[in-house]
Amino acid sequence: MSAISWNCRGLGNPLTVKALQKVVLEKDPTLVFLMETKFSVNQMEGIKGKIERQEGLVVPSVKCGGGLALLWKRTVNVDVLTYSPRHIDVVVIEEQGTRKWRFTGFYGHLETGKREESWKLLESLSNRSNLPWICMGDYNEVMYAREKEGGGVRPKGQMRNFQEAINRSRLRDLGYVGSD
């Protein structure tokens, strides 16, 4: 079982779609969580076919921004619990129902002033189930200054608020692979 999470910053560019196809072909993940698709539900149907993930849930973009999609292989059953423009929360059932776990794809607010709303959502999600849980996505914040490449210096208070939300949610930072 594997999952990838990718902030694609829009799927309107054919090169972005090709890059997504390449990653999915190489890694063959069971789950694919996409953020900032900037696509409607109908537009995402074409993407699902291109990456051979026919099952999924799409939260359409609003105007020209946002948009989430969680796509999965037919080899697993997925029960959708909740979703919003900031998250998709599901239970994954594998191996004829013998293994269950929870996956949350999460997309934190871009606006610094609204991040506290993101952290409250994260904490609320953490209390909804006792199943093993993985939460991945783009939180739009870093845990430590050393994780930030380019741009301005992150205020310590912002990082501390994120660290505290992660701790209160009983999550562990597993790091990431990829570019910013």
Positions of PLM-derived features:
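A shared catalytic/ligand-binding motif for oxyanion handling
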Residues: 1-180
